[in-house]
Swiss-Prot record:
Source organism of this protein record: Burkholderia lata (strain ATCC 17760 / DSM 23089 / LMG 22485 / NCIMB 9086 / R18194 / 383)
UniProt-recorded name of the protein: ATP synthase subunit b
Pfam families: ATP-synt_B (PF00430)
Transmembrane feature ranges: 7-29
One GO MF term attached to the UniProt entry: proton-transporting ATP synthase activity, rotational mechanism
GO cellular component term, pick one: plasma membrane
NCBIfam families noted in UniProt: ATP_synt_b, PRK05759.1-2
CDD domains for this protein: ATP-synt_Fo_b
Gene name in the database record: atpF
Record membrane topology: Single-pass membrane protein
Oligomer status and interactors: F-type ATPases have 2 components, F(1) - the catalytic core - and F(0) - the membrane proton channel. F(1) has five subunits: alpha(3), beta(3), gamma(1), delta(1), epsilon(1). F(0) has three main subunits: a(1), b(2) and c(10-14). The alpha and beta chains form an alternating ring which encloses part of the gamma chain. F(1) is attached to F(0) by a central stalk formed by the gamma and epsilon chains, while a peripheral stalk is formed by the delta and b chains.
PANTHER family: ATP SYNTHASE SUBUNIT B (PTHR33445:SF1), ATP SYNTHASE SUBUNIT B', CHLOROPLASTIC (PTHR33445)
Described function: F(1)F(0) ATP synthase produces ATP from ADP in the presence of a proton or sodium gradient. F-type ATPases consist of two structural domains, F(1) containing the extramembraneous catalytic core and F(0) containing the membrane proton channel, linked together by a central stalk and a peripheral stalk. During catalysis, ATP synthesis in the catalytic domain of F(1) is coupled via a rotary mechanism of the central stalk subunits to proton translocation.
InterPro entries membership: ATP_synth_B-like_membr_sf, ATP_synth_b/b'su_bac/chlpt, ATP_synth_F0_bsu_bac, ATP_synthase_B_chain
Length: 156
């Protein structure tokens, strides 16, 4: 085992190389690795944040869709209620108008009946006077009297 100066020189060169590597080469490599791991960690954090924001956006969209559906259903229900109310109002107005028309027709019919009765009374009175006049002008004869009464009945 020969330990000579070459081995000692190789050890010194190796130590100088190790020191040089530790002093000048190793820190930039460590910095590059640290920066890369930081970028990867930041990218993963951004991905997680983006995923969380996407989930939150999906939830907001679902809530807004549900709210829109509820609003739409509420508006439809309100429109149906308004339509029913309008239909009921139209129906009640039509019934009131029909009742008014019927009452007016009854009143007109009653007036016509009253007028017809008045006219009939006038005609009956005129016919009675004419009949009495004719009876008084003729002799009192039973057959003639009966014929006059039959003629008056026919005219009435």
């Amino acid at each position: 085992m020969n330990l000579n100066a070459t081995l000692f020189a190789q050890m010194v060169v190796f130590l100088v190389l190790a020191w040089f590597t530790m002093k000048f080469v190793w820190p930039p490599l460590i910095n590059a690795l640290d920066e890369r791991s930081k970028k990867i960690a930041d990218g993963l954090a951004a991905a997680e944040k983006g995923k969380a924001e996407l989930d939150a956006a999906h939830k907001r969209v679902d809530q807004e869709l549900a709210q829109a559906r509820n609003d739409g259903q509420q508006r439809i229900a309100d429109a149906e209620k308004r339509a029913q109310a309008v239909a009921e109002e139209i129906k009640s107005n039509a019934q009131a108008e029909a009742a008014r028309i019927i009452a007016q027709a009854k009143a007109e019919a009653e007036q016509q009946i009253v007028k017809a009765r008045e006219a009939l009374r006038g005609e009956v009175a005129t016919l009675a006077v004419k009949g009495a006049e004719q009876i008084l002008k003729r002799e009192v004869d039973q057959t003639a009297h009966a014929q006059l009464l039959n003629q008056l009945k026919a005219e009435l």
